[in-house]
Amino acid sequence: MVKCRLRHVNNEVAMSQIFHLAVPAGDLATTVTFYTEVLGCQTGNSEHGRWVDVDFWGNELTLHQSTERLPGVRHDVDMGAVSVPHFGAHMSESDFKDLKQRIEQAEHDYLDPPYRRFKGTEFEQETFFISDPNGNVLEMKTMVNPEVLFKT
C-alpha cells in the first residue's frame, strides 16, 4: 500500500520538514480524484470549490481551482529531456512499486515511463514522470541508497 502520509518523529508531526507547494488544478474535483484515487493521497483542509490540501507523501500540496495551466518545457539532462517545472516525491522501493501498480491499474499514461538512472553507481535510482489532469508534471522516484541524496 502506498504510504502518502505525514512524517512523524517521536510521535509528533515533524513540521519543520514539511514542504508546501500550491499549483493550479484546473477542475478541482477532477484533479483531487486523481491525487486520491490514482495516487492514493488523502485530502486535508479545504475551501469548497476553491482549494484543497493534499497530503503528498508528508508534504502539503495545495490544489487551486483554476482556468490556467503552468507552461512546460523540456530540459536536457543525463538521460534525455525532462519536463520542467515538475515536482514529486522520493519513496521506498516497495512504495514506489505499489504506486506504479496503482498508476497502471488506473490506466493512467506515463509521460516518461519508469527507467533506471545512474546504474551501477551509489546514486542509482528508478524514476518516472506523469502528469495530473491539469498538466502539472510529477516525478516519482526511489533510490537504491537514499542516504546519498545530497552527497556531492
Role assignments for model-derived ranges:
Residues 69-75, 113-121, 148-149:
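A short, acidic/glycine-rich surface segment
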Residues 3-29, 87, 91, 142-152:
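N-terminal beta-strand motif that seeds the catalytic metal site of vicinal oxygen chelate
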